[in-house]
């Protein structure tokens, strides 16, 4: 049994969309059917991994996109593809006598959204929940938060010496550093930027 016969592959942030030739996928399925091997097609319909459940690969950190398209025979939008029709044509040959496949449903319609303009804004730093206080930096799990984003904030002394350096280590997986609402730096684990030891803080 093949528990996961992949129609495509993972998509990772910052990389091109992964595809697999339709003929290669269909030939692999034919080889299994001819040998009476059970299989599960992963995926038949490319869906979506909602929220922050995309995951990542290690040891060379590579964050996965939340899309579950996987170059599947039925796309994330629910549309049939060349791969779908090649697979359908193959499966016709393995139906019991007298059986037939149902008609393919019409493609889902696409709506057109007229142009619009935003007229209101809600600044992030002006709309934060009540803070929790700690003398040490705690991981988000300590706040019963398994994923997402967390804000660490502190108040610096009024007089910050010239050349004062902020040291950040082991970022998982993305960080932005602000001082008085001004963006100073970004750290991106995908690019190997997991620490920052040369961030000079403003003195005013």
Task: Enumerate the language-model features and the residues they cover.
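Generic, well-ordered alpha-helical scaffold segments in large soluble proteins
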Residues: 28, 35, 90-94, 155, ...
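Conserved small/polar residues in nucleotide/adenosyl-binding loops
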Residues: 197-203
